[in-house]
């Protein structure tokens, strides 16, 4: 006959193993790269397809900024917030209402600084209308669908081969596997975005006051950045994300003073910048701080070894 002690031991093991599997399945996927070269300093599950929540808005912002830069789109033009922007978008902390009028510039601040979903949808709707005549594959698609198509076109151009966007804000959809990306793909996107001065400025703001019109009234709102690490230990961007399926997600950009090397009569300046992408973290800001410290340690070791770059380890 099995003793009570043995039964208790077996029961505890049954409880333990599922917990171990769950913890393993839910571990943070991350990548740490040198922002200058794209060299990967460390990665864990960086090619795993994950849902990424509001990190999606980095792609949303870049489609808008690229449209403005390449096609002369005016970021000071006003957009009218459509009723559809409130469907399934969750919180409305700014207090937008259908029919409110706001500039694209302030919508970008709202989407990037405070991660506002209504703002992201309105950007896609407004710029999608402008893209309809110039996108060959637009067909009869809605403005938002055309815009999301451009988000995926951008992803393809950046070799984000394991990414699929389905909306401009990253909210969970009815299909559990969509949208998705990877830590490595989002590092590629972040390198691209952080090379744009306008984007860098948006995501560097701890606070920003925006204004919008409601009929004859002018409303003001003070945005506060959702990135709690911004401004500490050289962190100068980028974006937070969180949904029920994505968990806590975070992209960090950080810098240190450039390293200056004398080489005979010449001087070489080595910028020191990191990008860290974390998906599915249990505590993104605590873990983000730890990975940042780890990243600089790895960077210093890599720099001391001559900054050798293996193309197979470069994004």
Model regions and ranges:
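Bacterial N-terminal signal peptides
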Residues: 8-18
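Hydrophobic alpha-helical membrane context
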Residues: 16-17, 69, 299
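Penicillin-recognizing serine hydrolase domain
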Residues: 25-29, 99, 125-315
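Positively charged n-region of N-terminal signal peptides that target proteins for export
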Residues: 1-5
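Active-site-adjacent loops and short helices of periplasmic peptidoglycan-processing enzymes
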Residues: 22-184, 194-197
């Amino acid at each position: 006959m099995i003793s009570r002690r043995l039964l208790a031991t077996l029961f505890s093991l049954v409880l333990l193993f599922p917990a171990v599997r769950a913890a393993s399945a839910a571990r943070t996927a991350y990548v740490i790269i040198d922002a200058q070269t794209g060299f990967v300093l460390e990665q864990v599950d960086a090619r795993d397809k994950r849902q990424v929540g509001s990190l999606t808005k980095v792609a949303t912002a870049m489609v808008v900024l690229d449209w403005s830069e390449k096609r002369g789109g005016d970021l000071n033009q006003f957009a009218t917030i459509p009723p559809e922007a409130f469907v399934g978008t969750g919180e409305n902390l700014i207090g937008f209402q259908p029919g409110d009028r706001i500039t694209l510039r302030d919508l970008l601040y709202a989407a990037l600084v405070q991660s506002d979903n209504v703002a992201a949808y309105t950007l896609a709707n407004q710029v999608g209308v402008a893209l309809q005549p110039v996108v060959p594959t637009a067909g009869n698609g809605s403005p938002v669908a055309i815009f999301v198509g451009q988000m995926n076109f951008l992803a393809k151009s950046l070799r984000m081969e394991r990414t699929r966007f389905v909306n401009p804000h990253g909210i969970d959809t009815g299909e559990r596997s969509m949208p998705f990306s990877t830590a490595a793909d989002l590092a590629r996107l972040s390198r691209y975005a952080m090379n744009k001065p306008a984007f860098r400025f948006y995501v560097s703001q701890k606070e920003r006051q925006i204004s919008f019109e409601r009929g004859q009234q002018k409303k003001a709102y003070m945005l506060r950045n959702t990135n709690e690490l911004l401004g500490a230990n050289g962190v100068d961007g980028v974006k937070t994300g969180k949904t029920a399926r994505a968990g806590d997600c975070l992209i960090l950009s950080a810098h240190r003073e450039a390293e200056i090397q004398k080489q005979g009569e010449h001087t070489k300046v080595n910028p020191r910048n990191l990008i860290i992408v974390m998906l599915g973290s249990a505590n993104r800001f605590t873990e983000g701080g730890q990975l940042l410290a780890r990243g600089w340690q790895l960077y210093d070791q890599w720099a001391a070894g001559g900054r050798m770059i293996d193309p197979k380890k470069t994004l």
